[in-house]
A protein has these predicted regions:
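Active-site neighborhood of glycoside hydrolase catalytic domains
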Residues: 346-382, 387, 391-467, 499-503
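C-terminal capping/lid segments that line or modulate ligand- or cofactor-binding pockets
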Residues: 272-293, 389-442, 485-493, 497-503, ...
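Aromatic-residue-lined binding/catalytic grooves and analogous aromatic/hydrophobic interfacial grooves
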Residues: 1-340, 347, 358-360, 378-381, ...
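Short, solvent-exposed positions on alpha-helices
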Residues: 230, 292-295, 367-371, 375, ...
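Glycine-rich phosphate-binding loop at the start of an alpha helix
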Residues: 233, 346, 353, 527, ...
């Protein structure tokens, strides 16, 4: 954590702060004793650094203390008066936050965790710099520029990480020296050019009126029922900003907390959940013109197609690759401990694979299609062909099978999570087979696997409509344990999949009945569940319903800084569909 504290400030007036989404620059300002103090900050991807500039207008009254801290064990060096270096090793092991433990964070000297380093330099104009107790002390300055960069020992999921902080320290030193020589204006210019290249591609405007109210007051008015079309636009652009901030070429994809986790034991371990969250995060990228930010997702799925081969082979005795519901930075693909209703779900890779195809659909990049998307789709298809089982009725089914995180009642009214061929399994396999056929057509491929796909598609069961008139969650007409369950998995074939067509009136009505029945038993205040409803109703052509849930999301499921209570960014693509 970077800390800076103003000293000698005791009469603050007119404090303001803002984030400009068009240039990704933060500013704040206040007055003290007739002197205006202004802070400007931005994170530069080209420079891999944070720059923060503080100015005292027409005055040499800027007195500051600067220091670094970390919840992780560390050591601090102050090599020069104007520089601080914080280094250390991550814990050797951390128990997830949902596991009770007297000693959840372990440091093992024999097996140290990943190394890391953070380097801070202060460049001062019109003042003096002194060395404090692990602090930089600045007096009588007119301007102070902070340069901050960080490195860690992570290389790749399949390579050992660095445990020596010295490697990270040296990388940080070199970068800070380069940045010091480059200068603020050049770094800023590069940042503006880089950010604009991805942000400027889309703009949404619903009203020409500009609100001057602070965000918390705008939200308060909106929650009272006041109309604010500008707030809807702001939320749309804010979500695009968040995606750009946390997912660019060379980074990991957006996970359950994005890059905004501050805890050693974060909720859900800051992992990736493949039964909705990871995919929903990236629904917006194609429709909202953020293909650059889609690259980490595509690369991640390709890695999983390699790492998941062992899971397919040893745990499912199938060719190809498989991913279950919980994935970490080391590309863990097997089931985790816990209830089968969530822990056992070998269909994650299939969903990820079908979504990866969107990259080609929005770019027409044949080389990526041939070198990455086709190989991982081919192997995902091979897994499905090996996993499907032929039953006595001549149809192919998955078994055992779960419907993500929901359960059903058996004939004795017991709660059960495992059966055969959930509707989600069926929809995913239909989608994957369709995508594979389309890719083969584009690349002029005709092989044995393609012929098996065509034969197997004809043997898949039809979607089932139950006695209550809605699409069934399982191939059998079970009653759900949780009628208001937050997942909408059974209608994947309608959205985000494509196997349920608008022309099939009976299935369309069954999907709508499923959604309406779910609405009766839930408030949909979980952010990503509400986002799913926005998308579903928009695709069903009911703009009023979609807008209702979009406004419900803003009223009940976001914090005052617009962070979602349950983070995936799925509402953005729904909003685009509502207003297009």
């Amino acid at each position: 954590v970077l800390h800076y504290r103003f000293t000698g400030i005791d009469q603050i007036q007119g404090y303001k702060r803002s984030l400009n989404l068009k240039n990704a620059i933060y500013t704040s300002s206040f007055e003290n004793k007739n002197v205006c103090y202004k802070t400007t900050a931005f994170l530069s991807k080209p420079s891999n650094a944070l720059l923060l500039k503080i100015e005292a207008k027409n005055s040499h009254s800027l007195d500051l203390e600067l220091w670094l801290s970390s919840e992780v064990k560390n050591h601090i060096k102050q090599e020069e008066m104007d520089s601080i270096l914080l280094s250390g090793n991550a814990p050797s092991h951390v128990q997830p936050n949902y596991i009770d433990s007297d000693n959840p964070i372990l440091y093992d000297k024999e097996h140290p965790g990943m190394a890391f380093s953070i380097y801070l330099r202060a460049m001062v104009k019109g003042g003096t710099v002194e060395r404090g107790n692990k602090k930089i002390i600045i007096k009588n300055a007119s301007t102070v520029l902070f340069l901050l960069t960080a490195e860690d020992g992570y290389k790749r999921y399949d390579l050992p990480f660095a445990t020596s902080p010295k490697i990270c320290e040296e990388l940080c030193r070199r970068r800070i020296e380069d940045l010091s020589m480059k200068g603020y204006r050049r770094i800023l210019k590069e940042h503006l050019r880089d950010y604009a290249s991805v942000y400027k591609n889309v703009y949404l405007q619903l009203s020409k009126r500009r609100s001057t109210l602070p965000l918390d007051k705008r939200l308060a008015r909106f929650r009272e029922g006041k109309t604010d079309l500008g707030l809807l636009c702001l939320f749309f652009h804010y979500n695009r900003y968040l995606m750009i901030a946390c997912s660019r070429k060379g980074t990991e994809p957006a996970n359950l907390q994005g890059i905004w986790n501050e805890n050693i034991r974060p909720v859900w371990s800051s992992n990736w959940t493949s039964n909705i969250n990871l995919e929903m995060n990236y629904w917006l990228n194609g429709p909202c013109n953020l293909i650059d930010s889609f690259v980490p997702f595509l690369d991640f799925v390709y890695d999983l197609s390699l790492a998941g081969r062992e899971t397919a082979k040893t745990q499912y005795h199938c060719p190809g690759w498989a991913v279950n519901h919980n994935i970490d930075i080391w590309r863990h693909t097997g089931p985790v401990g816990g209830d089968a209703k969530y822990a056992y779900w070998p269909m994650g890779g299939i969903w990820l694979c079908t979504q990866a195809f969107l990259y080609y659909q929005y770019t027409n990049d044949l080389s990526v299609l041939k070198e990455k998307i086709y190989p991982m789709t081919y192997d995902a298809v091979r897994f499905c062909l090996g996993w499907l089982q032929l039953r006595e009725d001549g149809r192919l089914y998955t078994a055992p099978s779960t419907s993500p995180e929901n359960m059903f009642k058996d004939k004795d009214n017991h709660a059960c999570g495992v059966s055969y061929m959930s509707t989600m399994d069926l929809a995913l396999i239909k989608e994957l087979f369709s995508v594979y056929e389309e890719i083969c057509d584009i690349l002029k491929v005709d092989n044995e696997v393609l012929q098996k796909v065509k034969l197997s598609t004809a043997k898949l069961p039809a979607y089932q409509i139950g006695k209550r008139g809605k699409i069934q969650e399982w191939i059998q007409d079970f009653e759900e344990v949780d009628k208001g369950h937050r997942h909408f998995s059974p209608i994947f074939g309608f959205h985000p999949g494509h196997s349920i067509k608008n022309t099939d009136k009976a299935l369309m009505e069954a999907c709508q009945k499923f959604v309406e029945d779910k609405e009766k038993h839930t408030k949909a205040e979980i952010g990503w569940s509400c986002a799913w409803l926005i998308n579903i109703w928009a695709k069903l052509g009911n703009g009023n319903k979609a807008r209702f849930y979009y406004e419900e999301l803003l009223r009940h499921s976001v914090y005052d800084n617009l962070f979602d209570l349950h983070p995936p960014l799925g509402e953005t693509t729904g909003e685009r569909e509502v207003f297009q």
